[in-house]
Structure formats: C-alpha cells, structure tokens
C-alpha cells in the first residue's frame, strides 16, 4: 500500500453542527454504504446516540475515494466526551472543523480546535448548513479568523443534509491532509490503541492505528506499559478494518487504522493510549499516550435489587472497557447496602452510563446525589481527598477544605449577558473577562466552583439565554471554601445516603429543600416522624411527617368530656411508646425520587 495515498482525519464540531450527517454523506459519496442501507447517523451505532441525536463513542471507518484510502474517525461533540475526541485526534493527521453557518463558533468548537492544534493536525474549516435561509457565511468566516486564527480562504462551504459541496470537501482532504510518510513497514511494530469494545464471543476487540511496522494474523504481541511475561503475551486471532462493518484481513500495515482480536477476556488488562509491539522484535520506546483524564463528578450506584450486585459489577467492567475514563470502587451504605462509587467526566456522561446499564445490561440502579472530590487539610498535617459526603472526617480534625474550580467560557448573544452574569454570581462565580466577538455575540469567562455547575447550571444557562448560549470548561485547580456537611436525621437516626456537602451560605437552602422532599416522599406511619437536617449536631431545618390517627372516640356518644380526653391520652401514650421502638422503612421509590437529579425531574414534567 502506498503511504502517500493514505489520508487519516477526524471530524470535530460542537454538538448539533451536523457532524454525523456529514459523515453519512461522505460514506454515501465514496460508495462505502449504498443509499438503500444508509440510515441517519450511520456511524452512531448505539440506540441511545440515535435517540438523543448525539455521538457518544468514537468510530473508525476505512473508505476508498478515487485511488486514495480515507480513514475517517468520527468523534463526539459534547463537553463531557472531550476525552474521546483527544483519542481520535492522536490517531489522525488531519481534522475537519465543522462550523454551523447559522450559529457560528460555539464553545466546544474552540475546545476541540485547541486539541487539534496541540496534536499538530492540519485543520480544514468546513462551513455547514449553507442552504439554510439564516446562514451567514461571511460572518462565520470572519469569526473563524478572529477567534481561532485559522485562514478561511480554503474553507469549504457544504450542506451535509443535501450533499452540496461534499465532493469539493473530498478533494480538499486529498489536497490538504498529510499522508503518514514516516510510516515504515520494516521498523519494529508500534501501534496505538485508541479505543476498545467488548464482544461476547471474541472478548476485547482493540481499535489501533499502526504508526510503524506490520501486524499479521498469528503474530505474538505485548502491551508496552507492562513488563513482558506470560500474562502479557497475546496472539492475533483475527484482524481487519471497518468499512463500516468489520472486514477481515491477513495483515495491517503502518499507517492503517484497524481492529485486532486476541482472545483478551479481562477488561483490566488493557489501557487505552497504550502501545502494542511484537515480542520477538520489540520497539525501544512506546508512543506518547494520552494525558490521563480525571473524573470530576462522583456518585454512588446501588442495585435496586441487592441480588444484582454481581451483575452490576460485571456490567461496569464491560463498560469501562470502551470508556476508560470511568473510575469506580466498591462502597457500602447503611441505607442502600453494597454498591459502587463511580467517577464521571460530567453529568451527561453519568446519565448516559445509567441508561446504558439499564438498556444494554438490564441492571436497575439507584444513584445517590452527585458530588465532586474535595481536598481536606487535617490539623495533623495529612491531606485527604473525599468524594463521598459520608467519608468526611470530623469537623474538629479539619483545618481547611478546598474544592475544585473550573474556568468556564460561554459564547452568548449580547442581549443575554446580564442574565448570564446574574446566574454566575448566584453560583459563587468570579468574573474574569468579557470580550465582544462582533456586534451580536460575546465571550464571557468566569471562574466557578465545580460543585455549583454539576447539577442544574447547564439547564439554567439554557433557560436564561433561551438556548442560545454554549458552554465549555476546564479544571484550573483547588481553592479554599467555607464548606459544611449536612446530615439528615429520620426519627433521630442518621440516613447516610442523604448526606451532602454544601457551602455554608447555601446549606440552609439545600437542607430545607431536602427536608420538604423527604416529607412528601416518605409515607405516613402510625407515629409522627421528625425529618431534621443537621450541621455538626446543630439542627438547621425540620419538617414533620404527620401520623395516622385512629378515631378512638368514635364509640362514645354523649357522656362527660373527660371520658373522651382519657381515651385520647391513652392513644398519645401508645404512639409515644411506638415512636421509641418504631424504625422507619424508607421505600425504594422514595429513595429513587429523592436522589434523582434535576435532569430526571425535568424529563418527568
């Protein structure tokens, strides 16, 4: 295979700018998929992706155009899946930057461009949706030059929906995307694992980009991140390329993107970003991997039925295979039993995983309220990281608490600037800068505590700006905050699943909300139940679940009032005794409804 005929590129764009539709048109025009077989969002293989209209997983396909071989790697566009994008870019030489002609540059476009520049990729600007009446191509071109600094004289104007301009785009890929000319089949094998997925019959299937060397069926290989021994020896059973369905081959050459099956059964044996090499002629050094991504949102996952605990563990193992950004460990809760503490890249990421567990693995779960990882400085000089409110050390042993902060960049129409600033202030934001992009839009930068943005910030921002704002963030480190742990007591008993960590100024507000929610959800008992929120033993909010009362005076008619009072007194004493020994059963539905995040409640409306 001639190396100068290989063109490997990724498609990057903000969510909803037409990335998957353009991928469909490219598949159609290169005759990779016939029009009859082509469905919308063809490369989005998960049902969930098609339903929500978003890409979640990356996908890699080999196509033929004239006498060239195109290797297209489709990427997600949502801020939570930036890690998937960075992996695709590390396996590419070029990137198509898609910008919606009606919306212009959005926050996520910018984030992905910086990733492409970091990876030293050739970027081709593509202006999509030019057929729409509201398209303003000249303004968007100007914006690309001003904000990103890429010349737009070679920008391609297309309509992914109708197919207009896509043929010009294919020629531009041939002209501008570099070929892997340094790829050499004779050098020792170096192949980058940029993704993996689980097949119930073949085990783990690796998606690789061969940078140097050649890989054949029957070859023995190893992972370079681990020492070579018996447990790090694998045989290639099958390999091939995707176009878009799997096509088997006898070998893969340098420069190619393909898949490899080697009867790998354990998900933990693989880390995405690793390099594979031959055992008999190993490479001297591994390829530069990816910077390890850190989970930022943590939540407890507990099976609804305790019998499903093992199944939940196996499902998490399988999902972590294709999504190496998830971290999880076992934990227990007095109220919910055995479960796992799971770390995610963001709330959408968490929601998607919950749905995947339910659909693909048939495991129903209760998720506790999401939280972030706090840095606790103790009086004895120790530093502890805590993501679970129940693990918070005693207040008397804490010197100070720091929480993670993000730098949020928001692109917004000028008329909504006031609304957005008001929202950021209410979330304890620190104003950094405001920059006008043109006479219609501006870029605002704020520093915000991550804990304030993980619940409802995104939804509120959309409603404050009628859906026109776009948001992108990066972690900038930890800052000291005045944080407290709020515990919930039911009938004087602490319920660990409802504990939260909140800022002192907002603790009362959160505690009050939670008490009211609990009062509405927990069924009435035969005795009165106090629902209390406490900070370090001090009660800050209270609600009461009223008791059922039997009408003990029904059998009386007439007579002295003292007879009535005597019976009521007797009932009161009985209830008091019952309250002392009565334990409260919190039904499963109550847990589910109380612990549901705002997104779930919004969907219910």
UniProtKB/Swiss-Prot annotation:
Keywords noted in UniProt: Cell membrane, GTP-binding, Hydrolase, Membrane, Nucleotide-binding, Protein biosynthesis
Keyword Metal-binding: no
Functional summary from the UniProt entry: Required for accurate and efficient protein synthesis under certain stress conditions. May act as a fidelity factor of the translation reaction, by catalyzing a one-codon backward translocation of tRNAs on improperly translocated ribosomes. Back-translocation proceeds from a post-translocation (POST) complex to a pre-translocation (PRE) complex, thus giving elongation factor G a second chance to translocate the tRNAs correctly. Binds to ribosomes in a GTP-dependent manner.
Cleavable signal peptide: none
Enzyme Commission number(s) from the entry: 3.6.5.n1
Compartment annotation: Cell membrane
UniProt catalytic activity: GTP + H2O = GDP + phosphate + H(+)
Gene (name only): lepA
Chain ranges of the tr-type G domain: 4-181
Protein name per Swiss-Prot or TrEMBL: Elongation factor 4
Annotated GO biological process: positive regulation of translation
Origin species: Mycoplasmopsis synoviae (strain 53) (Mycoplasma synoviae)
